[in-house]
């Protein structure tokens, strides 16, 4: 499985990269069909008009490619680590739903008459 990590308006530290790789490999250890993952981390600066103070909103986005399907999730938080945690939780729910649909699928049998 290939994991690509990019940063937009921020640099990816080794600690953040290790956190992402640990969480994503742990999340996908039961699913061997994952072809690739792309993770984009960004920092959005917002300015409050009344107080003239800015706040940074950290955004984490990911695309997970499986055979025949692409899953996308996005999460934001005040801290990058919290955004990554929210992102992996969302993707885990999507992967569990996809895996459950695959397990529930049973081809129809044609009965001879």
From Swiss-Prot:
User: Which InterPro entries does the UniProt record give?
Assistant: HPF/YfiA_ribosome-assoc, RHF-like, RHF/RaiA
Alphabetic keyword roster:
Translation regulation
Q: Which domain of life is it from?
A: Bacteria
Q: Which GO terms describe its cellular component?
A: cytosolic small ribosomal subunit
PANTHER family hit by this protein: 30S RIBOSOMAL PROTEIN (PTHR33231:SF1)
The job of this chain, per UniProt, is described as:
During stationary phase, promotes and stabilizes dimerization of 70S ribosomes by the ribosome modulation factor (RMF), leading to the formation of inactive 100S ribosomes.
Q: Provide the assembly information.
A: Associates exclusively with 100S ribosomes, which are dimers of 70S ribosomes.
Q: What is this protein called?
A: Ribosome hibernation promoting factor
Q: Which organism is it from?
A: Acinetobacter guillouiae
Taxonomic lineage is:
Bacteria, Pseudomonadati, Pseudomonadota, Gammaproteobacteria, Moraxellales
């Amino acid at each position: 499985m290939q994991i690509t990590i990019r940063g937009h308006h921020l640099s990816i530290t080794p600690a953040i990269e290790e956190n992402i790789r640990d969480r994503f490999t742990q999340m996908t250890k039961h699913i061997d069909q994952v072809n690739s993952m792309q993770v984009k981390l960004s920092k959005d600066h917002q300015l409050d008009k009344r107080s003239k103070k800015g706040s940074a909103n950290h955004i984490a986005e990911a695309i997970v490619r499986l055979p025949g399907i692409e899953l996308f999730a996005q999460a934001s938080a005040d801290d990058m680590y919290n955004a990554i945690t929210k992102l992996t939780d969302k993707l885990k729910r999507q992967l569990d739903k996809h895996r459950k649909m695959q397990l529930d699928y049973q081809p129809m049998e044609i009965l001879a008459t």
